């Protein structure tokens, strides 16, 4: 099985909260698609609560679009990581890590302004697969933690696992 790009970086050295360009690719028409690793917590050290990350999923995607989309950037998708340490964001364009960090900061400020659980978009059984699994309080706590810590940048060349280690870790 081919090794996915996200498994070629050393998760023990990742900073959080931090932005990382996980992948850049070109479409056949020449558009740039960039995938960002938006790491909320340090891998293997902390984990986002299930209700908090789910509520953030509903809020964060809209807020990030509000702050980052523009003439040269259009967000395709923002999805939580299975490990619950952050989100992956796929978009058309190539914004800088600092632009993404600024939009992320503004989005966390927006999360703190949400007044009540009934203001969470698509929180109903028709539009959400687990409508009972939400907590605005937990989402706000995550947002406060991000704002208090500040957002840095993780660079792939600083996190790359050596080839010898990748071979040693490979599962056949």
Curated annotation (Swiss-Prot):
Please give the cofactor(s) recorded in the UniProt entry for this protein. Answer: Fe cation
Query: Matching Pfam families, A to Z?
Result: LuxS (PF02664)
Which keywords does UniProt give here? Autoinducer synthesis, Iron, Lyase, Metal-binding, Quorum sensing
Instruction: Output one GO BP term.
Output: quorum sensing
Task: Explain the purpose of this protein.
Answer: Involved in the synthesis of autoinducer 2 (AI-2) which is secreted by bacteria and is used to communicate both the cell density and the metabolic potential of the environment. The regulation of gene expression in response to changes in cell density is called quorum sensing. Catalyzes the transformation of S-ribosylhomocysteine (RHC) to homocysteine (HC) and 4,5-dihydroxy-2,3-pentadione (DPD).
Q: How does it assemble?
A: Homodimer.
This protein is called what?
A: S-ribosylhomocysteine lyase
Gene this chain is encoded by: luxS
